[in-house]
Amino acid sequence: MKAVVLCGGRGERLMPMTDRRPAALLRLCGKEILLFTLEMLGKAGFEEAVLAVGYGSEQVERLLDEKYSGKIKLHIINTAGKSTVQAVRTAMCDETEILAVECNCICTHPLDEIIKVHLSHDTFCTALTYDTENKPAGIYIVKRELFESLNPEKHTDMTEDIIPEAVKSGEAVLLDGKGYYKRITTPEAFLDCQRHMLYNENMSQRLTENNFSGAAIGEPVYIGENVSVMSGSIIESGSVIDNNAVVKGGKVNGYVGIGS
């Protein structure tokens, strides 16, 4: 089974964070969301993935050239201007079924478990849900037949339209997600996810007295590469100081991000 990563959205509700980059390239504790997604697919054993790009496609390709070192064979297609339904259908190419991940989701649920559940049910779709109202998350397996049974012109969004309709008609099953999940569609959601990573996912850079002499640095914090923190600076817990940033004797309040 191939994977499809939907990473062409601009992230309008994330503005101004997405003024100069697509939402998939926002950095959580020094790593782009897209790289977290590919890492998740790699752990699940996926060997091929199609990246459906749009806004900022050149930036996505540059990131992959410079930073991606995983073993998944990647194919890039441009689905700019298409709905999520159209993007998934296009990215499926000749595949009969695929696992799709909308690249604004950070999730710790094992993907191989989703595949096992899907294979045990004779349905067109299996989707994760973390919602008490059973709203689908942005991770799902779909068969080609799903689009043949529903009107793609009437339904344009996978999680808002297609999957709920398929659940009602008995053509899809929902799987209760385990672990952490966050759909990053607002600055508040972004900060919540970053906070979770710092405190629960061992993303914090642990510091010793000799790292930045004369600076008061709380924990946990993330400090990237080639960062200068001058004597007298104060960095409170939960902060992210990304690559190449310089802090000169100032105070960085908790949960503030500086840098790339």
Task: Describe each model-derived feature in a short phrase.
Residues 209-260:
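Structural signal for interior beta-strand "rungs" in well-ordered beta-sheet cores
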Residues 99, 106, 112-119, 130-204:
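Catalytic-core segments of class I nucleotidyltransferases/pyrophosphorylases
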Residues 2-5, 27, 31-113:
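Conserved N-terminal catalytic core of the sugar/cofactor nucleotidyltransferase
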Residues 1-19, 171:
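N-terminal nucleotide-binding beta1-loop-alpha1 segment
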Residues 1, 126-128:
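Short glycine/serine/threonine-enriched helix-capping/active-site loop
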